[in-house]
C-alpha cells in the first residue's frame, strides 16, 4: 500500500463506528476496525463459518484502504463515487483469492 495501516478488532462499545457494520476503514488515521463479535447465537441466519467471514471483511476493508492510498477515495464524484461502491469492493474482496490462485498458477506475478 505504501503506508503503514493498523488493523484493530473490537466491539461496538469500543468502536462506535462498528454500529450496524462488521468493519470499517478510517483513512484519517489509516486504521481498519473489525467487529470481534460477528455472531448472534439467536439469529438463525448467522454465518456458520465466522473465521472465513472475518477474512472476507478484512479483505473488503483492505480494498477500501488501497483505493484511498491510490487517491481514489475522494476523486470519483463524477462517476457517483464508484470507488466507495460496496458491491464493487465486495467483488474484489471475494474474488481476489481466486484471481491470485490463477495468477500463481500461470506464473504471471
Can you say where each PLM-predicted feature lies in the sequence?
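Active-site scaffold of zinc-dependent metalloenzymes
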Residues: 1-54, 68-69, 78-94, 109
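Active-site recognition of the HExxH zinc-binding catalytic motif
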Residues: 56-68
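Long, well-structured alpha-helical subdomains associated
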Residues: 103-109
